A protein has these predicted regions:
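A generic structural signal for ordered alpha-helices
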Residues: 3-4, 34, 60
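Surface-exposed, charged secondary-structure patches
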Residues: 37-85, 93-98
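Short, low-complexity N-terminal intrinsically disordered segments enriched in polar/charged residues
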Residues: 1-19, 27
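Short, non-transmembrane alpha-helical segments in secretory-pathway proteins
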Residues: 18-20, 29-40
Length: 98
């Protein structure tokens, strides 16, 4: 996957989290992950004041992205796996970094 394209989508995803735009956040996830949105939402700071893409590590068929979410009460880094669906990078897996 192309790093620049994935980074662009990841940055946009982070901004959606900052705005609390859950429809846009859900749009970045494959359908199978939608039931996990409430759980993921509990992990993230609320409100999220800042989302920062820390790294984008592309491979041939996917990219691993680390995004740090900072709020008033906590900071959480999420590791996500992005794959192209059609021509659009989408999150196919995500979990907090320990």
């Amino acid at each position: 996957m192309e790093e620049g394209k994935v980074r662009e989508y990841a940055e946009r995803h982070g901004k959606s989290v900052e705005r609390g735009d859950m429809a846009a956040v859900a749009g970045d996830l494959i359908e199978d992950l939608h039931p996990q949105l409430p759980t993921i939402g509990q992990i993230l700071p609320n409100p999220c004041n800042k989302a920062e893409v820390l790294s984008v590590d592309p491979a041939e068929d996917h990219a691993i992205v680390h995004i740090r979410y900072t709020g008033d009460d906590k900071t959480v880094t999420i590791r996500s796996r992005w794959e192209e669906r059609g021509s659009t990078p989408m999150i196919v897996d995500a979990a907090p970094v320990e």
